[in-house]
From Swiss-Prot:
Protein role: Prevents the cell division inhibition by proteins MinC and MinD at internal division sites while permitting inhibition at polar sites. This ensures cell division at the proper site by restricting the formation of a division septum at the midpoint of the long axis of the cell.
Annotated Gene3D superfamilies: Cell division topological specificity factor MinE
Organism listed in the record: Enterobacter sp. (strain 638)
Pfam families in alphabetical order: MinE
GO BP annotations, alphabetical order: cell division; regulation of division septum assembly
Superkingdom, natural source: Bacteria
Record gene name: minE
Keyword annotations of the record: Cell cycle, Cell division
Name recorded for this polypeptide: Cell division topological specificity factor
Transmembrane segments: none
Keyword Secreted in record: no
InterPro entries: MinE (IPR005527), MinE_sf (IPR036707)
Length: 89
């Protein structure tokens, strides 16, 4: 039956083939371009502000941007602060 379907099926037009290929390319680029160009500078600026108040290692700050449903972006900022020094009387 599959052999009969193969010979009787219509060939896809070149426009449809090109459209499918373009959709694959666009989907791949969206996955690979997940990080916006401004994110490293944003991380640096946030780190500078935090360092004005607390002495921390730059590796203790993580910034992630997550895309949800195409039009919603979530910026997640995690800062591991050092333990507070006990004040002596």
């Amino acid at each position: 039956m599959a052999l009969l379907d193969f010979f009787l099926s219509r060939k896809k037009s070149t426009a449809n083939i090109a459209k499918e290929r373009l959709q694959i390319i666009v989907a791949e680029r969206r996955r690979s371009d997940a990080e916006p160009h401004y994110l490293p500078q944003l991380r640096k600026d946030i780190l500078e502000v935090i360092c004005k108040y607390v002495q921390i290692d730059p590796e203790m700050v993580t910034v992630q941007l997550e895309q949800k449903d195409g039009d919603i972006s979530i910026l997640e900022l995690n800062v591991t602060l050092p333990e507070a020094e006990e004040s002596r009387p």
